[in-house]
Amino acid sequence: MKTRTIALLLALVMAVCCLTGCTSTRVRSYSEESSDASSDKYAAAMSAYKSNKKVMTIDGSPVYWNEYAYFLCAVMSNIERYGTQITDWSQVYDESTGKTYADLMTESVVNNIAWNHLVEIKAAENDVTFDAAGEQYVQDTIDQTIQNVVGDGGTESELNEKLKSYYMDLDLFKYFTKMQYLYNALASKLFGENGANITDEQVQEFAEENDYMTAKHILLKTTDDSGSALSDADKAAKKQQAEQIAAQVKAVADPDKRVELFDQLMEQYNEDTGEASYPHGYCFPSGSMVTEFEDACKALEPYEVSGVVESQHGYHVILRMPTQGDDLVVSSDGSQQTLQMLVAQQQLGSLLTGWVDEAEVTWEPKFRSIDYAAVFTPKESFWKRLDVFDWFEK
């Protein structure tokens, strides 16, 4: 399959993260769309065929309608979110290639599906098995999702109903979660546990290309536990304390001794309770921290300490640290992974892109040319777009 499409790789992570607390790549449910007509359209696509209707195979791995419909709805949702309304699927969207919106949709959906299936295929080829730990990972994810989406005492049956508004059912959600586990396991097999086989040179190249940096800080908050601002007098006292901390650290020239002192002062004064989970400091890409903190970090060399930096959170004293492979990367969903593992996942992603390009796609006869206008037509007008035999056959 030698095709490249627009960058709409929603991938398996989106299906899982959108329901387990991740906010950075969340797929909205169709009930969050702007109109009832839009909701009806997505519901129509999901039920256009039986969920277990075979659509195609990818390198021999079968793909069923529930998976195809999920990515179909997710890609459509993203297209519409950026202001494009497709009214004519035969309209050419790329004059240089002559490809239509129907071509765009098919290529985008197939590439996303192929990504998932090739994770499973390549895992098997590399003796990566879905073991008891994988089963537990899936069950833990389901339990957490029930807690988040259904509530205390919720059941898998209730979760299955909720999942319909995210273009999927429980079986598909379990499959995506399994693929997420296999993806991480395959990365560990190819690149070492937590990316241990990734070299320092590869880490530094990745950090520079993607603007990652690492820093420790001591935060003196200018709000109380309820979020209310401190008095001007209390703020002034906090600022003076921050200035004294900065001066004390700057007075130590030896890098190792400076870090040792900074750690001691962190333990004594730091009011950022989350930093304890990052023993080497926060490792983060540009754009993920408040501007004042990030700008101050960029201005520092490794082991250099800032003056007092004020942000909405309070007064910071920042110690820039060298970025290393075992640094824990800040994640929006609270999960942790090393920078080495992040590099390993990127390299696995590059491998998967090549495998997707080379994959053999074999369509079931009915789906060789999908009428997307008919698929997205709500049931009350379904008969106008698909013949009666197709209706009975689904």
Question: Could you tell me what each predicted segment is?
Answer:
Residues 66, 70, 107-112, 116-124, ...:
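Solvent-exposed, polar/charged alpha-helical surfaces in well-ordered, non-transmembrane soluble domains
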Residues 1-103, 107, 358, 362-394:
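Short, low-structural-confidence N-terminal segments
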Residues 5, 132-134, 275, 306:
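A generic structural-conservation signal
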Residues 60-62, 67-69, 132-134, 219-224, ...:
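A mature extracytoplasmic/lumenal domain signature
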Residues 94, 224, 270, 284, ...:
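Acidic surface patches and DE-rich sequence motifs
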Residues 244-293, 322, 328-330:
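Peptidyl-prolyl cis-trans isomerase
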Residues 74-105, 124-206, 232-237:
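Charged, solvent-exposed helices and adjacent loops that form client-binding or oligomerization surfaces
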Residues 24-50, 158-237, 288-394:
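PPIase-associated folding chaperone regions across multiple families
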